[in-house]
């Protein structure tokens, strides 16, 4: 139970001491409990920001944050509670996550350090609508904090001479296969179908998976996963009938492999060379376009 030192959310700053979290008193010494005080600032739009100072016991912090969040969200009718802490504070991070807060992002180099350098700060939150506890609540919290990778789905279309379809884009010098970045919660194959429709105006029945490639960090991008799907046979007449998305695609062409080597990045060409050489029932896994 949390004591209500201020009964109105609009009151601004309402200090909440950890000793009011009565269910923890039988697990931790009174001295440990009274050493932690949370400062809680509430905005006029129903958002509370929780902070504390100095190193704290992680188990105590978890319980205090959980109790404070439940009091603010359920007891006082707020809609959002926020916590910020240095990205290097792993113990605090675990406590915040275990208290049901979800990682929303990182504010880069905003915390001034004694040596004159700056550190990143992680932003965590709990909403009144968040499910907390149980399998779903645990998974949702962990999903917010675990690594995520970009997923790219491209399509390999060829003609009877084994020339491949490549696209010249509006945003970079090298060419690429039709396709693009898969949206969140979108299956990779359907992402490829959508991208081809958007870029080329083509409703394509995408076939089997040919290549899965891990791409290392490159030109400011983090690492990513690329999938290449079979797109079937096309002709020059097919290309002439496509409706190119003018903001993304300058041109498309059927090119042989020697020409492709001059248009693609070395990584993309390694991947393409492997894909076109696969047998009818073969699939390849590569790292940086190379078989491990």
Enumerate the predicted regions with their spans.
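Conserved acetyl-CoA binding element of GNAT-fold acetyltransferases
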Residues: 38-56, 65-66, 175-180
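Acidic, metal-coordinating catalytic segment for phosphate/diphosphate chemistry
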Residues: 117, 121-154
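Conserved acetyl-CoA-binding loop-helix of GNAT-fold acetyltransferases
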Residues: 58-74, 94, 98, 188-193
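Conserved catalytic-core motifs of GNAT/GCN5-like acyltransferases
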Residues: 84, 102-117
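Unchanged
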Residues: 135, 182-205, 213-268
